[in-house]
Amino acid sequence: MYCGSCIRDNSLAAGLGRLGWDVTLLPLYTPIRVDEEDNSVDQVFFGGLNVYLQQKIPLFRHLPAFVDRWLDNPKLIRRVASKAVNVSASELGDMTLSMVRGEHGHQAKEVKRLVHWLKEIGKPDLICLTNLLVGGSIPALKRE
């Protein structure tokens, strides 16, 4: 299955790159899945597996960074996503609200990681969030 958001974001990044812009595409939840050249960095922010576990099991909200890196590994996420994993939409409501709460939600350390990466590594002039589920990060992004 290919996500329309992945295709749109990857095409936008490629098009802006052809126009001479320096563009960094950060995958959210899962690695970018497209048929054409993948224009994203080889990291996943708010990794779907990690975010889900942080929501369901409080211990995962306090694990060290090396465990988070393992859970957010694109190869691991691809492997898990390739299995027939069904999550009921009715089970995702609390996680959706938590994500929108940003720094005050169960995924607060994911917000901190994204903000740190953008501030210290990415250093963008412009940030375009094409998925408003991470909109809870906006106050932290504006502050930093």
Predicted feature locations:
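Short catalytic/ligand-binding loop motif for oxyanion handling, primarily in non-cytosolic enzymes
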Residues: 1, 32-36, 135-138
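A short, glycine/small-residue-rich beta-strand->loop->alpha-helix junction that serves as a flexible
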Residues: 1-7, 106-107
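Short amphipathic alpha-helix
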Residues: 5-16
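A generic structural motif
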Residues: 19-24
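A conserved catalytic-core segment of Leloir-type glycosyltransferases
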Residues: 25-113, 121
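Glycine-rich phosphate-binding loop signature in dinucleotide/nucleotide-binding domains
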Residues: 118-124
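Active-site proximal beta-strand in glycosyltransferases
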Residues: 126-128, 141-144
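Short His-centered aromatic/hydrophobic patch
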Residues: 130-134
